[in-house]
Amino acid sequence: DYQDVDPLFGTLADFDAMVARAHELGLRILVDLVPNHTSDQHRWFQAAIAGAEGSAERAFYHFKEGRGEHGELPPNNWVSMFGGPAWTRITNPDGTPGQWYCHLFDSSQPDLNWENPAVQEAFEGILRFWLDRGVDGFRVDQPHAMGKAAGLPDHPDVERAGAGFIEGEPSPPMWFQESVHPIFRRWRQILDSYPGDRAMCGEAYVLPLSFMALWVRADEFHQTFNFRFLDSEWRPQILFNSINESFEAFDAVGAPSTWVLSNHDIIRHATRMGGE
């Protein structure tokens, strides 16, 4: 649920109290936003699998007919980040095999259809919900995965790239699509319409850095994670080159670089680099 707190951690009232106390202490609160996919337990997806083919509910996600004589094969050759096809077939209410849905990550994380204006409108409401509660911004998970090439075509080089991408080569059909930038510009307008300083940081695994810089232009994200720096070996010359490349790329668009050394996907640097 994008508009509630997991009961494991408390209630919305607890959240409001935390935000108020944090602000008293001069701290800022960013909400972690996951826009590429929902849980398969989310009411939107439950409505989608209960809905008919071609319904408005299914249009929230990427549902397609399978290939093969009986639709038994995935709709395209995309690979999940966790292995295997990026597609799972549902079972219809009458027990017959149904359509397939796209999930770039786990099968329990169906990808939303960001070409659908209803999805865009829903998330604008989610942003406002948290901004109205006083949060200072958002850390946006996997924004580079939101857009998909029209028609969801096969990956032309899946044998080499797998579920990822090859730096310096054309973007694969499931990553880095230009269609996401108008969405981020609209989000930035929403943040800028609120008083005070609000920030939007993207966990966008986009390389090279000159390409990543396009995501932090003045009307899009305020910052992105600097994965070039995060992935750099802990050697002086490599770090020196990474820092210089970062300044050059981000200065070109008037944005600050970030100096992140670990996150929830990367072992903490004290352990990774600390040795004894």
Model region roles, listed by residue range:
Residues D1-E276:
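Active-site and adjacent substrate-binding regions of carbohydrate-active enzymes
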